[in-house]
Structures are given as C-alpha cells and as structure tokens.
Amino acid sequence: VGQVSQNGKIIKVAKAPGMKYTHYAPKVDTVTAVNIDHAVNEYDKQASLGKNPVIVARDIYRDTVKDRNLISLGVTVEDYTRNIYSALHTAEKEYDYIIVEELHGSGLEASVMNRVTKAAGGKEV
C-alpha cells in the first residue's frame, strides 16, 4: 500500500488490485497442513481439545483420514481448484476448525495455495 496526497491529506492507495480487497476467509479457525500426516495429527489434537474439526483434502487421502471428518476436494489438482471455496464455505457452517491440504508445486498449485494460505491467515501445521 502506498501513500498519496489528495487535497492536502495523505491517503493510502493499493499498489495492486489484490491488495485492495480482503480475500475470503472462513469465520472459524483455519490452518493449512504441510502433508496429510500433519493434518491428521492436528485433527486429533483439536478433537482432544473438544473441537469439531474437519480435514479438507483430495480423495487420495481418504484411507489415511479414515473415520475422521473429511470434505473431499475430488481427485485432481483441477478438482481441488474447482472445489476449494465451496468446501471451505461448507466446512465453516458444519465444523469449528478447518485443516486444509496444502498443494506443492508451481503454476496452478502455487496460485491456488496463495489464495488458500490467505484464507487460513497464513497459519500452517
């Protein structure tokens, strides 16, 4: 954010459109998980504290997540991209702690993770 003088008053101006508006963030605590093992450990920790957590991840992790709450993002990175925001909206209505699978890579993965990281307020497990 930069400063500009207008009519003798200093005002702040966004340097880029992405800085102008706040991005969507769930109203409940949300974190990203480096890998599915971290997600499961965080889930178990939060459940032991009395929270009602959910893991938001792709189907490839269904066997690892087992009987824990899971909102599926589909199979592919493209599915993840299409489904992430509707999954977050659903999660914040039904659960009080959201753990989101991180994607690793460049291109589409990095672009999506930029938004997901902002939605989680930069919190990672």
Annotated model-derived regions:
Residues V1-V4:
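A conserved active-site cap/scaffold subdomain adjacent to cofactor or substrate pockets
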